[in-house]
Amino acid sequence: YSAAPDMDQLISTDTMVEGVHFSFQYMMPYDVGHRLMTANLSDIAAMGGTPKQIVLSVAAPPHIDTKILDEIYKGIKAQCQRYKLNILGGDTVRTEGPMVWTVTIIGEVPKGTAVMRSGAQVGDVVGVTNYVGYAATGLGALSYNLEGYDMTKIGHQRPDPQIELGDQLRQLG
């Protein structure tokens, strides 16, 4: 894959480790796939780009029920369909440790317009596009089995990437 001549290519990789980034005690397998994709999609959105393709890898222990893997994949695939991403391939390996999922995402942005942290300068205005601590509050509510906090729980389990907003902010400069 290569970007069109008038586009720059973007790439990002995110990894989620069972017991560190997710737990089946408070997340359904489908939600794990959704959240993994949102992390990657958000990286492209933060650069003001459009996601195009992914490469997916999983390291799974031999005792894992393949139905769990299938459900995680369904969460990944649903996000890919929603954002019209191609799954180029990947790898599946066995591990004696916890389950590990890695996605490398490829996107594109009009040439010379990518928003990069390295472009930040003293005096720039820095903003956030969602509630600070929202997903962490949801994680706490899930971990301690607290009643209520429904929106923050959803914010942790099924966050939404801000693809359109990232593009709009890039256009504003």
Segments from the language model and where they lie:
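Helix-biased detector of long, well-ordered alpha-helical tracts
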Residues: Y1-G173
